[in-house]
């Protein structure tokens, strides 16, 4: 089983319900919940609220670790294969579209070279994303055409891959499943309000203090973790780029809503996903029974 969809839709709770109903275990596919200590800002389900359901691939990386979908893919498939061999149902839960596809579909990822990546990261900081995009366009026009000039992270990755392999494909191949899987999509008409409520709850739970603690663990040096929703906005406030905690909070709400729209667009393109408008395990039971 896989439970996917935009943030704040109720995927985590539904994943636990499904695991309890089917005798399963949760496998995380939220790229930011892989980071240790990033708990409040990623809405990681506290252990006391997991209702005895084992959760895998939470708290795997330090905040200084760069995103690595290839290693995540290997780890997730190893865990899923082990659960299947033991007669347990893996329940993959997350809204990180590439990470979900990396596990479920026949995707291969080019290798990485930290030295090459660091050199292009430095160049990004020096000249900016649009100028670096021009360089990508000169070396790999088709790749550049598929990447926004403002998306520095993807531009750097594309340049790294071009340097290492001589080519880069910016689009993913067609869906080709590795597993027999039922994918449940959770979306809600009140998502904007739920996002605002979640961010308010984050601040009430001491989210800025969590960010302060993670700064001491190297959050600023983490190329991926420091850009996470909420964390980037609080760091900007700490650095004086925002005037107040309230401004950082409102910026987090806006950025999260924008991200949720992108998530929705990503997952809606996959016609293998059966969509629910509420995270209801009864609907899931009926759906599974009809397949």
Swiss-Prot record:
List cofactor names only: Mg(2+)
Q: What is its EC number?
A: 2.5.1.75
Q: Which reaction does it catalyse?
A: adenosine(37) in tRNA + dimethylallyl diphosphate = N(6)-dimethylallyladenosine(37) in tRNA + diphosphate
Q: Where is this region: Interaction with substrate tRNA?
A: 30-33
Q: Looking at the record's lineage, which domain of life comes first?
A: Bacteria
Q: What does this protein do?
A: Catalyzes the transfer of a dimethylallyl group onto the adenine at position 37 in tRNAs that read codons beginning with uridine, leading to the formation of N6-(dimethylallyl)adenosine (i(6)A).
Q: How does it assemble?
A: Monomer.
Recorded protein name is: tRNA dimethylallyltransferase
């Amino acid at each position: 089983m896989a439970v996917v969809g935009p943030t704040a839709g109720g995927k985590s709770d539904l994943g636990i319900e499904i695991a309890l109903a089917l005798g399963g275990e949760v496998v995380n596919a939220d790229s930011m919940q892989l980071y240790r200590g990033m708990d409040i800002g990623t809405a990681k389900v506290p252990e006391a609220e997991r209702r005895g359901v084992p959760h895998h691939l939470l708290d795997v990386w330090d905040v200084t670790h760069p995103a690595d979908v290839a290693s995540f893919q290997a780890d997730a498939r190893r865990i899923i294969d082990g659960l299947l061999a033991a007669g347990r149902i893996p329940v993959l839960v997350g809204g990180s579209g590439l990470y979900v596809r990396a596990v479920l579909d026949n995707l291969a990822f080019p290798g990485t070279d930290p030295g090459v990546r660091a050199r292009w990261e430095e160049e990004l900081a020096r000249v900016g994303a649009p100028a670096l995009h021009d360089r990508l366009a000169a070396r790999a026009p088709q790749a550049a055409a598929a990447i926004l000039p403002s998306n520095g992270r993807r531009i750097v990755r594309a340049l790294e891959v071009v340097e290492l392999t001589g080519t880069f494909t910016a689009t993913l191949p067609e869906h080709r499943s590795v597993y027999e899987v039922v994918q449940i999509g959770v979306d809600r008409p009140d998502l904007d309000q739920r996002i605002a409520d979640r961010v308010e709850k984050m601040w009430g739970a001491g989210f800025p203090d969590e960010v302060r603690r993670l700064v001491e663990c190297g959050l600023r040096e983490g190329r991926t973790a420091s850009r996470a929703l909420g964390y980037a906005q609080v760091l900007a406030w700490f650095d004086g780029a925002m005037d107040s905690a309230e401004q950082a909070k409102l910026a987090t709400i806006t950025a999260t809503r924008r991200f949720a729209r992108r998530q929705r667009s990503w997952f809606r393109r996959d016609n293998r996903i059966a969509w629910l408008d509420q995270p209801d395990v009864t609907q899931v039971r009926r759906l599974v029974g009809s397949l």
